[in-house]
Amino acid sequence: MAVAFHTLKVVDVRRETPDAVSIAFAVPPELADEYRFHPGQHLTLRRDCEGQDIRRSYSICAGLDDRELRVAVKKVDGGLFSTMCNEAVRPGDMIDVMTPQGRFGVVPEPDAARNYVAIAAGSGITPILSLLRSVLIREPDSRFMLIYGNRTAKDILFKEALEDLKDRFLGRLVVHHVLSREQQEIELFNGRIDADKIEVLLKSFAPASKIDHAFLCGPGAMIDDAKATLTRLGTPQGHIHIEYFSTDGVPVAPRRPSAKDAGETPVAHAHVTLHGSAYNIPMLEGETIIDAGERAGIELPYSCRGGMCCTCRAKLVSGEVDMALNYSLEPWEQEAGYVLTCQARPLTKDIVVDYDEV
């Protein structure tokens, strides 16, 4: 399905925690197919904020059988878009919404009998909730364990929804809340999610080698630690799926020269295919493909510009690029030639990029 923005109406804004809301959108019948999603995918929202074209990606929290399109937005200190969503968005508002994107997740199979593990922190629960709601209904023989970290009990996003799911799917869903700033009776559930906690809790659920899918979502440091732990315990690399919600604790790439520092003479040309149209975009020193497209007035798909959301994913058909950051492409995607165009800078004078070859 082509990546595109459509203007959708907000039909519901629900306060989930003191600093988080969920927002539901009405999807016109003629756009129903375009907004059909897989559990774990996200939406990119776009709006003018104080004269700026701001876009942010937020995960879908609805299940496949909920018959709604809903995302959760947690307020971030200094975050222009998240603050607007939490304080100003009301039912009836119109917001530009990109069609669902992302490969974090799974397509439920009715005959499957799988062992799922999810490790999340904070708003990282959002895509996990969509997975829980979808898998537990559509895979009646599958089991799910969730390890969910927060500061305090009042910070637990979708607490009631998780309790309802646990009661409804008794014996198939196990939920462990780990709190870093609030004492609980069982010491294991105090502090941050770490290797020791993961190892102990896994033993009560299933051998690590028998985990069919492990979904890790939250801050970078937590994800990296959890991935290393699961790998050490025997979970196959291909069974571990990650979605960074922030890069806290993750090494930052060295700063590159920006296009503003460069002259106006192109150092390369990007030959881009998008929605069946071809573009020849001159690139200045220090520019990414997205930077160059923006300067040329060409609307290329992107959202986070930080290498996390994968909205800008495209196939590098020829030429060479260097990606400053990559928190979202799987190893097989890189081997197949996919790049993040918000991070890709040319290493050859000509590069050919195809957004349509997904």
Protein language model features and the residues they cover:
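Ligand-binding loop in jelly-roll beta-barrel domains
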Residues: 64-67, 109-114, 139, 346-355
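FNR/FR-type flavoprotein reductase catalytic core
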Residues: 83-262, 269-271, 278
